[in-house]
Amino acid sequence: MSISRQNTEAHLREEVCRAGRSLFERGYVHGTTGNISVKLPGDEGGFLIPPTDACLGFLEPEKLALVDAQGEQRSGERASKTLTLHRRIYQHAPEASCVIHTHSSWLVDLTLRGVWREQDIVPPLTPYFVMKVGHVPLVPYFRPGDVRVAEHVAQLIDTHRQRGLILRAVMCDRLGPQVWGSSTTATMAVLEELEETARLWLRSLNSGHPVAPLSEDAIEELRQHFKASW
């Protein structure tokens, strides 16, 4: 392994631990729920992911699992079973370098009460949701670790791309969101905007006066000015 790759891997290990601690401290995950993976750059590829049943708030860089591009573990403690799903996301969304899964309270609550639509779990309430998040379809309930989730998510990514839309997140019924992006920072920004929009939507429903979505004209303006994927 080159010195450059070693330095990059060491940096990404620290980044995963920082992101996990931030998510834990802010209540996006609890106990041993949730997961984060990152894709290593370069021809060798590979991934870093926390060990199975790890608490994201207390990750240790040296214990993260290093898995090669073929899915074989090379070092660290036993990789989380979530990697199967994350690898499919990376395969079908090559622009992604990070995938985050949480059990965010507002989003899980939304699936328990009933999402806005199966194709869009929340309506486009704000311009930043349209610009930074975009469509978020619902994945039907499967038990944790079921391989059918990976197949379902891959199909959703592909069908949206065929329509000229970039998917950045899906919502697993009763479990939580899977969100991906070009970096841990970008991925967390999508997650935060999605959770906040779910909170706004549920609060408006609880008030008895649901907020109207942005108009089609307003969304078209966001497409024209910011290339919003909606």
Model-derived segments and their meaning:
Residues 1-230:
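Glycine-rich flexible loops
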